[in-house]
Amino acid sequence: MSNAKEKVSMVSLGCPKNLVDAEVMLGRLAKDRYEITTDEREADIIIVNTCSFIKEAKQESIDTILDLADRKQDGRCRLLIVTGCLPQRYQEELARELPEVDIFVGTGDYPRIAEIIEEKSSRPEQLRYIGDPNFVFDESLTRLNSSPAYTAYLKIAEGCSNCCSYCVIPSLRGAFRSRPLESVLAEARSLVAGGAREINLIAQDITTYGRDLPGAPSLETLIRELAAIDGLAWIRLLYAYPDGITDGLIQTIKNEPKVCKYLDLPIQHISDPILKRMNRRSTEPQIRELVARLREEIPDIALRTSLIVGFPGETEEDFRTLLHFVEEAQFDRLGVFCYSREEGTPAAEMPDQVSERVKRERYKKLMKAQARVSFKRNRRLIDTEEQVIVEGYSEETELLLKGRSSRQAPDIDGQVYITAGNANVGDIVRLRITDSSDYDLIGEIIS
C-alpha cells in the first residue's frame, strides 16, 4: 500500500478576503494528509475558490471551473471541488449545470474541507455543503500564507451588515462579526514570526471593527496593539468606509510610524441622488469634507477609492459631478466598476437602468481622467525619498529590481522599479524617486 500523500492545488479568484479563505482551507489540508502543489497538472484534487460579487467575477469563476474540468478529463485529477461565494449563491443551478464538479462547499464550511473530502470517498454522488455563512477564522486554525513571506493579509472580521442596494455580500457572508482582539493579535504575531514585514488589514469594512465585541475595542486600539509587535514594519488599512472614519483613526494613521500613510476609502459615487439610491450612509458634503480633512492632517497620505458608474438612474449630470470630483479630489489610486445588475438586490429592480454602452463610455472617461490625475500625483514624488519593500526582479529584465512603496498596496496598485542599488527580497529600503509614469515609480536605493 502506498503512503504517498495526495496532492491538492487551489485556484483562488476574487478579492484578498477570498484569498485568506483559500489559505485557511490549504492550512487545514496541509495539516491533514495532503501535499499542496501550485501545479494543477500534478494535482489529485483541484479546488476553485470562487467569487460572485459582480457579473464579470461570476463569469471568470465559471470559465475557470470549465477549464479545470477539461483538465480533470485529461489528467490525474480525481476530484474537482468548487468553494466560496458562487456555490453559496447558486448551489441549485451549479449542481444542475456542472455535473463535472464533485463537491460544492459554501462560505460557512471552509474548516471542514478535509472531512468533506474524506466523506466523498464513500459517496460517489455529487455532494453539496452549503450551510449558514457564519464561519469566523481564529488563531487555533492553521492558515497557509500563499503570499510572499514578507507580506500578508490579516482578516479582522467576517460578513457585512451594511445594506447597499447593489450588493449581495450580506447574503453570501452573513452579518458583520469581528474577530476578538487577542485572536487578531495572535495571528499577527504568528505571521510576523513567519517573516511578514507588512500586514494588510482587511474586512468588508474595517472601520466597523470591534463594535460587536464585549468592551467594543476600536480599530485604533487594534492598530496600536499591532504596532507594538516587534519585527512588524508596515500596517496598511484596506476597505475603510468613509462614514466610519473618526478623528481618532485619522490621528492614529498620522502619528503611528508603522501605519502606512495610505487609506483605501471606497466611496462608490459622489452625487447625492445616486448615493441615496445606493443606500450609502455618506453624502457629497461629508465625503468632500473627509478628503479635505485627511489631506490637511496627513499631507503625504495616498488615498485610494473605488467607484461605480452606470448605477440605475445615473444621469449625465450625476456622471459629470462624479467626473469633476475625480479631477478635483486627486485620488492617488482609483478603481472603477460598471454597475452589475445582481438578482435579489433592490437595485436590480430599480427603474432607469443604464445601458451597457453608456456604462462603458463613462468607465472609459473616468479612467482616462484618473490616468491624468495619477500621472500628476506621481510626478510630484520625483526627487523625494520613499520607503520601498523589495519584491524581486522585474518581469522584463533581471537587471532591474522591483518593489512597492508604502503608498502602494499589493496586487492593486503600481510598482517601483529600482535602477540602482542592491537589496534582498523582503528588505525595506530608502529610495530616491527619479522618474514616474501614470501608475509606477522609478528610483535608486540610497540606504
UniProtKB/Swiss-Prot annotation:
Reactions that this protein is recorded to catalyse: L-aspartate(89)-[ribosomal protein uS12]-hydrogen + (sulfur carrier)-SH + AH2 + 2 S-adenosyl-L-methionine = 3-methylsulfanyl-L-aspartate(89)-[ribosomal protein uS12]-hydrogen + (sulfur carrier)-H + 5'-deoxyadenosine + L-methionine + A + S-adenosyl-L-homocysteine + 2 H(+)
Subcellular location: Cytoplasm
InterPro entries: Elp3/MiaA/NifB-like_rSAM, Methylthiotransferase, Methylthiotransferase_CS, Methylthiotransferase_N, Methylthiotransferase_N_sf, NA-bd_OB-fold, Ribosomal_uS12_MeSTrfase_RimO, rSAM
GO cellular component: cytosol
One Pfam family from the record: TRAM_2
Residue positions binding [4Fe-4S] cluster 1: 15, 51, 85
GO process terms (BP): tRNA modification
EC code: 2.8.4.4
Domain spans labelled MTTase N-terminal: 6-122
Binding site for [4Fe-4S] cluster 2: 160, 164, 167
Residue span(s) of domain TRAM: 379-447
GO molecular function, one term: metal ion binding
Cofactor remark from the record: Binds 2 [4Fe-4S] clusters. One cluster is coordinated with 3 cysteines and an exchangeable S-adenosyl-L-methionine.
Major enzyme class: transferase
Tagged with keyword Acyltransferase: no
Keyword Membrane: no
Domain of life of the source: Bacteria
Family, as annotated: Belongs to the methylthiotransferase family. RimO subfamily.
Protein's name according to its UniProt entry: Ribosomal protein uS12 methylthiotransferase RimO
Gene: rimO
